[in-house]
Amino acid sequence: MELGLCWVFLVAILEGVQCEVQLVESGGGLVQPGGSLRLSCAASGFTFSSYEMNWVRQAPGKGLEWVSYISSSGSTIYYADSVKGRFTISRDNAKNSLYLQMNSLRAEDTAVYYCAR
């Protein structure tokens, strides 16, 4: 019985650590077609510099769509064909932050954008 209680306690501790991970996006807004926006994602609760990061988006009534990827060091970057040449992903490991510069915005870029590990 005592071993069982210890196991439950250990699981609770691990779940508590997981719950401290936070990714908070900001920078959205309304712009005209052809305009620009810069999204930011502030990370906390984990070693940001050790993780590859992504931007994904969800247009109204649609599923999740992957937008862009950046390696932990920032040396490797990929984009979805739909945003290539218009969007730029970057990161600042010293500030635990991820960015997405979006230029030449189109109506079809309308979506909720999320950063993801």
Curated annotation (Swiss-Prot):
Signal peptide per UniProt: 1-19
Classification of source organism: Eukaryota, Metazoa, Chordata, Craniata, Vertebrata
Compartment(s) where it occurs, according to its Swiss-Prot or TrEMBL record: Secreted; Cell membrane
Domain Ig-like as annotated: residue spans: 20-117
Region ranges (Complementarity-determining-1): 45-52
CDD domains: IgV_H
Region (Framework-1): 20-44
PROSITE patterns documented for this protein: IG_LIKE
One GO term (biological process): immune response
Main location: secreted
Gene Ontology CC: extracellular region; immunoglobulin complex; plasma membrane
UniProt KW keywords: Adaptive immunity, Cell membrane, Disulfide bond, Immunity, Immunoglobulin, Immunoglobulin domain, Membrane, Secreted, Signal
Highest taxon listed in the record's lineage: Eukaryota
GO molecular function terms noted in the UniProt entry: antigen binding
Framework-3: annotated segments: 78-115
Maturation and modification: The N-terminus is blocked.
Region of interest (Complementarity-determining-3), ranges: 116-117
Subunit structure: Immunoglobulins are composed of two identical heavy chains and two identical light chains; disulfide-linked.
Cystine pairings recorded for this chain: C41-C115
Protein's name according to its UniProt entry: Immunoglobulin heavy variable 3-48
Record function comment: V region of the variable domain of immunoglobulin heavy chains that participates in the antigen recognition. Immunoglobulins, also known as antibodies, are membrane-bound or secreted glycoproteins produced by B lymphocytes. In the recognition phase of humoral immunity, the membrane-bound immunoglobulins serve as receptors which, upon binding of a specific antigen, trigger the clonal expansion and differentiation of B lymphocytes into immunoglobulins-secreting plasma cells.
